[in-house]
Amino acid sequence: TSPEQTSLLQEKGFHKAFALRCLPREVERNLWSQADFDSVTAKKLCELRARFWPDTVMLTPEQMAVVLGDLYSRGATIVSSERAYGIYFRKENTLYFVEMMAEDDRSAEELMEAAREKEVIVEKAVITVGAAQNLFLGEGARQEYGMIRFEGEPFDVSESYLRLMMENG
């Protein structure tokens, strides 16, 4: 969002409420790291979110398909295991994870290692996670991402995660 858009939204009662962390990381070579790879589909993403974030509020698969158009055009891939999932695309020698959920740091690392083996010429990754997510705590630069306007009594959204919104840039 541009500063002008942010100001306009603030004038309409919106407040900054959601943040992300971007984490650049080296990805180790590990032939033993295994994961499943799928094309990005709304159905698959909804299944994984329901499994890893059971209390999530999300669009239906039909509505999600519209939001995922940008990921389709970038050639995004879903990588998953029993303990983690991520959505990534490759640009040159870097994997860009635009969403990742894992039980712990090691599970996330295993996904990145498996993706490195699949993509071959990759050495590093940039991971985007919610600011309050427990993955790689203390790492990464915080970036404001979303805004909210409460219609009634405000409530705490500091632990909330908002991602894969419809963006125009």
Name each model-derived stretch.
Residues 42, 105-108:
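Residues at or immediately preceding the N-termini of alpha-helices
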Residues 2-31, 101-105, 113-169:
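Active-site/acyl-donor-binding loops of N-acyltransferases
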